[in-house]
Each structure stands twice: as C-alpha cells, then as structure tokens.
Design a protein with these regions (language model features):
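N-terminal Sec-pathway targeting helices
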Residues: 2-22, 27-30
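Catalytic glycan-binding domains that act on GlcNAc-containing polysaccharides
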Residues: 32-220
Length: 220
C-alpha cells in the first residue's frame, strides 16, 4: 500500500509531537530533581547555589554573632531544605501523636515537652508544634524550650532564630568540632552512635552533611 504525501506528513508531525512531549517530560523531571532532589548527587550543585544565594549573607552574619561554624550551618540548610526560599514545612504525624498523648496525660513527656506546656494548645496548635519549619526545618515544639514562637522559626527571623536554637542546644559540640555528632543531634536529638550506624531518617544524612561542609569551607 502506497503512503500518500499527506499521510507521510501526518506521521512526521506525530513523531515530532511525541519527541516534544518526551523532551518536556525529561525537562520537568530534571527541574524537579534539581529543586527537590538534594539527596541526588547531580542536584547537589543546584542546592548549593540556592543556599548561597538565599541564605549565605545572613547565615554569615549570625554565625559570627553566635560563634557557630558557617560551613556547618550552610550544609545543614542544604540538607534540610535544599536552600529553597521560602523553605516550606513538613508535618510529622508521629510527633503529633506523641504530643497528643502528652496533652491527654497518656505520656509523661516528649523530650522536654510536658503536659503543662500543652494545656492551652488546641489541635491546630499541636499540628504546628509537630511541623518542621524554616531553612533548618526545626520542629515547632523545639520553640518551647527556648521560649520562642513558631513565627520566629518560620518567618523573616527564621535564620537568626534557627542559629540561636542551634547555639543554645548543641553549639558547644560545634565549637569543639564534633560535626558528626552535631548533624546527628540535629536530625535525631542524639549523639552519633558508637556503633557507627546512624539512626537518621536518611542513612547518609551525616555523610552528606560532612561532605557539604567541605564544599562550603572551600568557598569561604
């Protein structure tokens, strides 16, 4: 059967359209990976550029003020939020459940949070306390210990408030250059295990943080 010129043209247009769709899908996938895929090595360069652009100057200012290492803070922002601004938030259902248990008296405490801290907290407030905020993705309930407001760690003051929290909670470990412990503390609240096996959500969280630190140290 002979193919008419019109049919040939239609096949060409169909092929070209398919190629465009495939190219668009690849481009969208690549953009998403570079924005959200800070855990993929090819996207790390983009995460570093975003972190430098969005937070570099302010982090440097407050790192000097609180005597907390600049490379660590920058690496932590890249790990936790990919350098995005606004940094976004992440609700943790299991934390919400623990806080609700504390409020109802079924649990004596959750870390430093006691029932007295949650007496006036409604469900919306508990959800905010169970959500991580800002470039350092600090959990809302961490504010209670330092008498901060959630708006302090998610708004315009997020960088300063986050660095203050780090300074007061595990800043001594950073000043002693115990960076492996510091990354593990930020993510889990515990020192890096003596077994050598981290308990972070991402098994390579600490390793990536240390590697990012080296890159930021070279840029200074």
């Amino acid at each position: 059967m002979r193919t008419t010129p019109l049919r040939q043209q239609r096949w060409k247009w169909a092929g070209a359209g398919l190629a465009v769709l495939l190219l668009a899908a690849l481009l969208i996938s690549e953009v998403n990976r570079r924005i959200d895929g800070q855990w993929n090595r090819p996207g790390e360069w983009w995460g570093m550029q975003a972190t430098q652009k969005n937070y570099g100057a302010e982090v440097h200012k407050w790192s000097v003020h609180y005597n907390v290492p600049f490379p660590y803070l920058m690496a932590l922002i890249q790990l936790e939020s990919g350098g995005r601004k606004p940094a976004g938030k992440r609700f943790e259902a299991h934390v919400f459940e623990r806080l609700m248990e504390v409020k109802q008296g079924d649990r004596s405490h959750y870390e430093h949070v006691t029932q007295a801290d949650l007496q006036e907290a409604n469900e919306e407030a508990l959800r905010n306390l169970a959500t991580s905020w800002g470039p350092f993705q600090l959990m809302g309930y961490k504010c209670i210990l330092l008498d901060l407001q959630i708006r302090d760690i998610r708004g315009q003051d997020a960088v300063r408030a986050g660095i203050e929290w780090i300074h007061l909670t595990y800043g001594d470990a950073l000043r002693d250059k115990k960076f492996q412990d510091a990354f593990h503390l930020h993510n889990t609240g515990k020192l890096f295990p003596k077994s050598g096996k981290p308990t972070t959500f991402h098994p390579d969280y600490v390793e990536k943080g240390l590697r990012f630190m080296e890159a930021y140290d070279e840029k200074r």
